[in-house]
């Protein structure tokens, strides 16, 4: 599909449905969210999309991990403070921490002391017994609308699943120890089949789901948890089997993987992921330069003045940016677009940098990126 030229009428504001039935102001976009995010994941965007927020997050209650993690988004109310936590699909107990708004497995008493125990100790979930029909009746056409880009989040991937069963130290040792790797591989093979079974049900019962957002953290603030060679050997083949299945069924695949993971990007590509959002400790421009023609990278403006970036918190940085003269905000937006928006090598805007999205920045980023992708600049 060729991208039409920018029309100034697109900058006209209109009322659109917002949160909790309220209306909000929006630009007059030429495509709805479903169609534009689809073009974005195909590396053919019409403008610079917003990673995560241009999608509808879907984490249905019927998948036990979503309740255990205190992260349920679907039709109907869910109160994480009173309902979050409990057992995941393997019976591992998670504790919801109200002060941080998330769940964790309390460390010190791992479900598995040794990965070789997985065959005897693990009880595999009966996916067929989950109330898929009831969830479909509640969500299809209401929460999951065809005009939206609906993205189901999957909370616990491969390495994260190993951590949930063995604690962090046990998981990293099992992954790296040659004596344990055969058992880890056998476990991951069966885990992949389970995940495919779950997504077979998702595809059958939720036909408006367009993409998967798959969680598997591989790094810390300063470094990856394990070498690229180890990831290539132990994790990538299983991820690739999963993404091949999803792609064969028309589902886009986005990886959520926290950490300073530049060294792992080639593994993300080999594993079949369509998109990845680096956290802000990463140099997103370098990642985009080196890999942006092979995987959709969520980027953010790295041309911020020191008076903004010297602030301690994201909220303080956002406030400092908002205090800049409007024309400077617009200039930064134009420079950002000119840096990372190229036909054939696009990006999308990172949710991690949402604190910089002032009205002036958003407007200028939209207009500039429409000019770029529409071929008039």
Language-model features and meaning:
Residues 1-52, 87, 121-377:
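Active-site loop segments of alpha/beta catalytic cores
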Residues 55, 98-100, 301-303:
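A broadly conserved detector of short glycine/acidic/proline-rich loop/turn motifs that flank catalytic sites
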Residues 58, 94, 101-102, 158-160:
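Short, acidic Gly/Pro/Ser/Thr-rich loop/turn segments
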Residues 62-65, 83, 98-100, 107, ...:
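Short aromatic-enriched loop/helix-cap "lid" or pocket-rim segments at secondary-structure transitions
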Residues 69-87:
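Short acidic, Pro/Gly- and aromatic-enriched capping/linker segments at domain boundaries
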Residues 82-127, 133, 146-153:
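A contiguous, low-structure linker/loop signature
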């Amino acid at each position: 599909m060729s991208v039409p030229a920018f029309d100034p009428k697109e900058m006209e504001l209109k009322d659109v449905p917002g949160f909790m039935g309220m209306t909000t102001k929006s630009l007059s976009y030429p495509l709805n969210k479903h169609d534009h995010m689809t073009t974005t994941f195909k590396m053919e965007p019409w403008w610079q999309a917003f990673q995560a927020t241009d999608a509808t997050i879907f984490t249905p209650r019927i998948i036990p991990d979503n309740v255990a993690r205190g992260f349920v988004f679907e039709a109907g109310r869910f109160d994480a403070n009173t309902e979050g936590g409990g057992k995941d699909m393997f019976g591992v107990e998670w504790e919801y921490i109200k002060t941080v708004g998330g769940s964790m497995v309390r460390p010190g008493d791992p479900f598995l002391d040794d990965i070789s125990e997985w065959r005897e100790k693990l009880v595999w979930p009966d996916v067929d017994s989950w109330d898929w029909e009831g969830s479909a009746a509640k969500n299809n056409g209401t929460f999951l609308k065809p005009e939206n880009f609906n993205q189901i989040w999957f909370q616990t991937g491969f390495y994260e699943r190993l951590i949930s069963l063995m604690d962090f130290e046990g998981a990293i040792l099992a992954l790296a120890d040659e004596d344990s790797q055969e058992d880890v591989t056998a476990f991951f093979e069966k885990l992949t089949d389970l995940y495919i079974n779950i997504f077979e049900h998702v595809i059958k019962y939720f036909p408006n789901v367009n993409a998967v957002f798959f969680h598997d953290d591989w790094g810390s603030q300063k470094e990856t948890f394990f070498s690229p060679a180890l990831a290539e050997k132990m994790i990538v083949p299983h991820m690739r089997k999963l993404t091949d299945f999803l792609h064969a069924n028309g589902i886009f695949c986005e990886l959520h993987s926290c950490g300073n993971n530049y060294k792992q990007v080639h593994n993300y590509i080999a594993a079949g992921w369509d998109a990845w959002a680096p956290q802000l400790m990463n140099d997103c421009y370098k990642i985009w330069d080196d890999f942006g023609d092979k995987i959709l990278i969520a980027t953010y403006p790295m041309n911020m003045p020191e008076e903004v970036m010297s602030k301690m918190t994201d909220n303080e940085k956002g406030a400092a940016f908002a205090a800049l003269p409007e024309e400077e905000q617009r200039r930064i937006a134009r420079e950002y677009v000119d840096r990372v928006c190229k036909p054939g090598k696009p990006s999308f805007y990172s949710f991690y940098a949402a604190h910089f999205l002032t009205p002036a920045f958003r407007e200028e980023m939209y207009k500039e990126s429409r000019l770029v992708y529409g071929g008039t600049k």
